[in-house]
């Protein structure tokens, strides 16, 4: 179970399930298709702060403090085991947004559905949306504000990017 990606990934899974039900698929077909689809939804994140992750034991407090002092943003993904995998560290928002677009390319995104969820950072979410649409012709991008547990971990300035790869 990829618990880290539950919020954004579940949105696409619910939509996909609704589509399958509307098509009149049988229960066994739906189960098989949902298991297949689950493998093709992914989550990337950009965090401006690691403080709450440190408080909950996901990163060491010294690492969180050092990142804050140096203005480092962490770009990562949800692993298959539900852990946070750090892909890279960048300085500044623009570098983080560029890196997200590069990671999308590397992880098989072509032009499917992509959802950007921001935590008090609508300007960065809009910039990322425009960057994605410029690179991936026909991309279906929507934006919302983080809520609940996602906003706690993303913290102010954080972005979560849920997307379907080319095989979805």
Tell what function each PLM region has.
Residues 10-168:
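Mixed-charge interfacial surface used for oligomerization/domain docking
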């Amino acid at each position: 179970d990829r618990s880290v990606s539950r919020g954004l990934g579940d949105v696409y899974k619910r939509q996909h399930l609704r589509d399958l039900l509307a098509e009149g698929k049988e229960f066994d077909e739906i189960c098989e298709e949902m298991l297949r689809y689950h493998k093709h939804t992914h989550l990337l994140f950009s965090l401006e702060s690691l403080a709450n992750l440190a408080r909950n034991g996901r990163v060491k407090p010294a690492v969180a403090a050092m990142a804050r002092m140096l203005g480092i943003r962490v770009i990562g993904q949800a692993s298959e085991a539900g852990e946070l995998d750090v892909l890279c560290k960048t300085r500044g928002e623009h570098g983080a947004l560029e890196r997200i677009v590069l990671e999308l390319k590397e992880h098989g995104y072509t032009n499917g559905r992509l959802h950007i969820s921001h935590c008090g950072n609508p300007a960065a979410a809009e910039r990322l949306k425009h960057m994605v649409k410029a690179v991936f012709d026909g991309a279906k991008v929507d934006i919302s504000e983080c809520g609940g547990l996602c906003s706690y971990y993303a913290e102010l300035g954080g972005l979560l990017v849920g997307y379907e790869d080319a095989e979805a």
